[in-house]
Amino acid sequence: MKRTLLLAFLIAWAAVAGAQDTPDTLVINGVTIIRDNKPVEREPKKGFLKSINTKKSLRNITTEWGMVDIGMSNFVDGTAYAGEAAQAYAPGSNEQWFTTKYFKSRNINVWIVTQRYNLIHHFLNLKYGLGLELNNYRFKNPVRFNPRPATDVVNPPVVSMDETPGRSYRKNKLAADYITIPLMLNFNFTPDRLYPFELSAGVSVGYLYAARNKTITSDEGKLKAKDNFELDPWKLSYVGDLTLGVVTLYGSYAFKSMYKRGLDHTPYNFGIRLRPADFFSKIQN
């Protein structure tokens, strides 16, 4: 009995193994049809490293639209507050007046269009564009910018400290917006890769098209004072960015103070750049 069961088991096992390895056959009107039972090999999915090494076609001129920078705005304060110029612009001021709320002082740049022109083997490129640079400096103290100072004074005061009894501030910021044109040399260390390693450095020229002092207080509510507040209409800055795959970091540092007189505040920005092209390429993949 045991031998019979063992023999039956071996026969059944051999039949199953043979059925797996032997193709199915079917005879119809004398025609033999054979079906292969071998498993179908599927093409492996592209991994992360393989997608990084994917090559792209190279063009002498590449254009990008609608890039957005999101980051921080601030300035280096080199003002001599005891001097005549600072006291004429902001009477009674000191180094504490213009202290900013660091993480609430924000920079947003909207790059309408940027282009890159191949100079040497797509490794060295000329990079340029056109965009809007929006800077917001949030102050800790209730400083107020006067949009219409007295005209009968040669250098009228512009900034004062609000000491109204019982008034509290929810927001107090100076906004300075520029039309900006950057011009940079771009070094692309992986020009034929979809996710590159790039470094760019150069200068930008900005023109002030709008400025305002926005406040929200307990008794006045929301107020906007629009004026140039004797800000320098031109802003020249050192600019640069670093791209690692889909991540781009940017930064800028102005040549000089953003004020024509009184205050020596040299602005700088830094943050991360968002590319719509990277977003849409992820959706398509």
Predicted regions and their residues:
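Bacterial Sec-dependent N-terminal signal peptides
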Residues: M1-P23, P276
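Outer-envelope beta-barrel architecture signal
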Residues: N60-G66, H122-Y128, A175-I179, R193-L199, ...
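Short loop/turn motifs that connect adjacent beta-strands in outer-membrane beta-barrel proteins
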Residues: T54-T62, D77-T79, Y117-L124, T190-P196, ...
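Extracellular/periplasm-exposed beta-strand and loop segments of Gram-negative cell-envelope proteins
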Residues: T79-A85, S93-K104, Y137-A176, L208-S218, ...
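Sec-dependent signal peptide cleavage junction
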Residues: A17-T62, F280-N285
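Transmembrane beta-strands of outer-membrane beta-barrel pores
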Residues: M72-G78, R116, L132-R138, V203-A211, ...
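Predominantly the C-terminal beta-signal and adjacent terminal strand-loop region
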Residues: N228-N285
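Residues on the lipid-exposed face of transmembrane beta-strands in outer-membrane beta-barrel proteins
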Residues: K56, V68, V110-R116, L130-L132, ...
